[in-house]
């Protein structure tokens, strides 16, 4: 069987780089794409100059302003980013029809059998990066491997403007030293739990039996067992249509307080808005997910007359669904029982199957 050749291409600080390209006065300066510095908006993108101060995507703009008070804040121009993204996708399609765009600024290509009959994936990756720069004046990083998991990890290895190739025989040696927190599917809470179990790196994860991992992480334990060995059979899906998108947050401590939980719900709504904008997605059906301290799970949904994607609309709709889970205790509004996780997702009303990646960890 032919060894798969998968490329993951990820644009470097995409939104911020587009702004620095279009407005030369921003070049070389810490630039933050998002809302005003004194708002509850989150950072959509940060230039590498801003990242040196600790600014990261999804961070509240107010915190970013504290870390980098000299930074320039600009509002996102999503229509411009979408046009550039189309240019990038057109380049991908010159090599293969097996292109899976994950967002405006990144995608997978399966070039095992490609249109130009180029035998080496690394050659294609080099050509694509060169062509992207020629047509858009933007840089991209790329990773080459035999699976989605490996190629994505590889693309993150030498950013910005880097290329990393992981040969099949080198997969284990590549994974072993990496922190598990860098693995897709390992969020902050899971990474913390893994550390409590003595799992810090890919090698640590690989020493655990499948039974141990399932015991601690449920069915996700099987996934962790496989990726620690570089096993990922997911195909590049060129025709994938996203039906839903959301985010969830697991708390360090279970929560009862109404006001505290509303703040957490607002934070989730803000992150969902950012992801919806990045994926160019809107939907009519909002689903609220609540997991209690005893791991019991409740979901409630509401279908609206028009598609929504803004944080305030998500938040106000989620609150309506949230109210039934509260009661007045000793004159104070509290949850009916302690809550450990909140999630919000948005989907089309005709979605029959829930996207397995519907709720992504914050």
Swiss-Prot record:
Its main location: cytoplasm. Gene3D superfamilies: 3.30.70.270, 3.40.1170.60, 5' to 3' exonuclease, C-terminal subdomain, DNA polymerase, Y-family, little finger domain. The keyword Signal does not apply. It is found in: Cytoplasm. Its cofactor is Mg(2+). The active site is at 106. Its EC number is 2.7.7.7. Signal peptide: none annotated. One of its GO terms (biological process) is SOS response. It is an enzyme of class 2 (transferase). InterPro entries: DNA/RNA_pol_sf, DNA_pol_Y-fam_lit_finger_sf, DNA_pol_Y-fam_little_finger, DNA_polymerase-Y, DNApol_IV, PolY_HhH_motif, Rev_trsase/Diguanyl_cyclase, UmuC. It catalyses: DNA(n) + a 2'-deoxyribonucleoside 5'-triphosphate = DNA(n+1) + diphosphate. It holds the Pfam family IMS_C. One of its GO terms (molecular function) is DNA-directed DNA polymerase activity. Keywords: Cytoplasm, DNA damage, DNA repair, DNA replication, DNA-binding, DNA-directed DNA polymerase, Magnesium, Metal-binding, Mutator protein, Nucleotidyltransferase, Transferase. The keyword Acetylation does not apply. Binds 2 magnesium ions per subunit. GO terms for cellular component: cytoplasm. Monomer. Poorly processive, error-prone DNA polymerase involved in untargeted mutagenesis. Copies undamaged DNA at stalled replication forks, which arise in vivo from mismatched or misaligned primer ends. These misaligned primers can be extended by PolIV. Exhibits no 3'-5' exonuclease (proofreading) activity. May be involved in translesional synthesis, in conjunction with the beta clamp from PolIII. This is DNA polymerase IV. It comes from Leptospira interrogans serogroup Icterohaemorrhagiae serovar Lai (strain 56601).
């Amino acid at each position: 069987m032919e060894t798969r050749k998968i490329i993951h291409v990820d644009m470097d600080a995409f939104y911020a780089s587009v702004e620095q390209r279009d407005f030369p006065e921003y070049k070389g300066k810490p630039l933050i794409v998002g809302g005003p510095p004194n708002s509850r908006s989150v950072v959509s993108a940060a230039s590498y100059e801003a990242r040196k101060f600790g600014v990261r995507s999804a961070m509240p703009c107010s915190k970013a302003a504290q870390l980098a008070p000299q930074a320039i804040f600009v509002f996102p121009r999503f229509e411009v980013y979408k046009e550039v993204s189309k240019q990038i996708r057109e380049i991908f399609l010159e090599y293969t029809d097996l292109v899976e765009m994950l967002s405006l600024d990144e995608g997978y290509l399966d070039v095992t059998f490609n249109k130009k009959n180029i035998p080496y994936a690394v050659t294609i990756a080099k050509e694509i990066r060169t062509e992207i720069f020629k047509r858009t004046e933007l840089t991209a990083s790329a990773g080459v491997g035999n699976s989605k998991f490996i190629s994505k990890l590889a693309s993150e290895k030498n950013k910005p403007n880097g290329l990393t190739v992981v040969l099949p025989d080198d997969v284990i040696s590549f994974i072993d030293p990496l922190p598990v927190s860098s693995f897709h599917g390992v969020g902050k809470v899971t990474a913390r739990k893994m550390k409590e179990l003595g799992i810090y790196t890919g090698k640590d994860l690989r020493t655990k039996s499948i039974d141990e991992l399932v015991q601690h992480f449920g069915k996700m334990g099987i996934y962790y067992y496989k990726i620690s060995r570089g096993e990922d059979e997911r195909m590049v899906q060129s025709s994938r249509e996203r039906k839903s998108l959301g985010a969830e947050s697991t708390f360090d401590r279970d929560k009862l307080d109404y006001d505290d939980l509303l703040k957490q719900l607002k934070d989730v709504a803000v992150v969902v808005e950012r992801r919806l904008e990045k994926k160019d997605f809107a939907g009519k059906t909002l689903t609220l997910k609540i997991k209690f301290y005893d791991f019991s799970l409740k979901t409630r949904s509401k279908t609206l007359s028009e598609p929504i994607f803004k944080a305030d609309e998500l938040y106000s709709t989620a609150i309506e669904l949230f109210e039934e889970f509260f009661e007045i205790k000793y004159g104070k509004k509290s949850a009916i029982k302690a809550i450990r996780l909140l999630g919000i997702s948005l989907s089309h009303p005709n979605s029959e199957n829930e996207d397995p990646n519907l709720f992504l960890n914050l």
